[in-house]
Amino acid sequence: VYFWLKNPDSAEDKARLKEGLATLRGVQEVQWMVSGEPASTLPRDVVVSDWSVSETMYFASSADQDAYQVHPLHQAFVKNYSHLWSRVVVYDTQVKP
């Protein structure tokens, strides 16, 4: 998930969003989660780096991901922190061996 903050230069807004993301670790179905910011790599035509904060989660199954979507902690995150972002892009990936 990639978030573009309404105020991308605001360290306070970035910290608040990360604080909100940390609450999502309390969702039992989330097996693993990390968040980050754009890497300081050399510019390349294929790199998108204008976003503010990202988070990646792993779930054991699609059913667990579905349960996460309606979980009260996720719903509270959206309600309490969505005012911080102007855009969100989600890339759902199913990993198969």
Model-derived features: where do they sit?
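Short S/T/G/P-rich N-terminal loop/turn motif that feeds into the first structured element of a domain
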Residues: 1-56, 60-67, 94-97
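Sec/Tat-exported extracytoplasmic proteins
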Residues: 9, 25-28, 72, 81, ...
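C-terminal structural segments of small proteins and small subunits
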Residues: 62-82
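Charge-dense polyanion-binding interfaces
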Residues: 80-97
